Amino acid sequence: MSLAQQIEPPQADPGWSAHLQLRFIQREGVTRLGARRHVGPLLVQRPFYPEGAPCHVYVLHPPGGIVAGDRLELDIHLEAGSHALLTMPGASKFYRSIGPTAHLAQRFHLAAGSTLEWLPQDSIFFNGAQASLDSRFSVEPGARLLAWETLCLGRPVMGERFDQGAIDSRLCIDLPGEPGLHERLRIEGGRLDKVGGHPLVATFCATPADQAVLEQVRQQLEALDTPAGATLLGPLLVIRLLDHDNQHLQRNLQRLWHLLRPAVLGLAPCPPRIWAT
């Protein structure tokens, strides 16, 4: 089935729909964007190759943000042996809603021997937002993954709390022969007790990892002045960080990535250029 055949026409909805599908392939030792297809304002810039074989791609969310009833779908397929690093130049903004829920669904399939680095900007939920996030990763044998997700509840830099609204966030990572990670976080009406009262929560996952990698990460986390922890679920390393300052949190995530990229992928760090702006 072609990418074009897989995308169904948008259905009638109070909001608008956007769908982006990307397929990465390896040719002569270099990862290429073998196919792309989009419906609506969910796009990618041209690929970058700052380190040779891996393909760096920037995913562009709608600049106007996400409002009531909007539906965004992102489907990423990595074929065997390919390596893609995906990030975003800006945050995903979910605005206040007095009506339908806004939906963001993200699907990632990692074929055998492929590598994905999913390093997006944060998802910001304005006070009163009604939003559903569903991120799922399917990891085949020999594939490698570095992925983080950051939720910003309200706009702490402006003193805005998340006092109203509801967030339903699901994160699933399926591993071959392992239970992986299946979790759900629901936040309603300003009740941030599940995250210790912190408006920012980040999850960083890496596989394959082992006890030695876990110990390296824990040593780095011990130096932080904000709550953080790490654990191993089989070969999956799961790191959690809480914060009140988004820039501080992003710096800590990037430091962890600088540690984990050589430890898990065997590659020297090559930060996306957007991080320097």
UniProtKB/Swiss-Prot annotation:
Main localisation: cytoplasm
Gene Ontology CC annotations of this record: cytoplasm
Subcellular locations according to the entry: Cytoplasm
Gene Ontology molecular-function annotations: nickel cation binding
Keyword annotations: Chaperone, Cytoplasm, Nickel insertion
Keyword NADP recorded: no
Pfam families (UniProt xref): UreD
Subunit structure of this chain's protein: UreD, UreF and UreG form a complex that acts as a GTP-hydrolysis-dependent molecular chaperone, activating the urease apoprotein by helping to assemble the nickel containing metallocenter of UreC. The UreE protein probably delivers the nickel.
Similarity comment: Belongs to the UreD family.
Function: Required for maturation of urease via the functional incorporation of the urease nickel metallocenter.
Full protein name: Urease accessory protein UreD
Gene that this sequence comes from: ureD
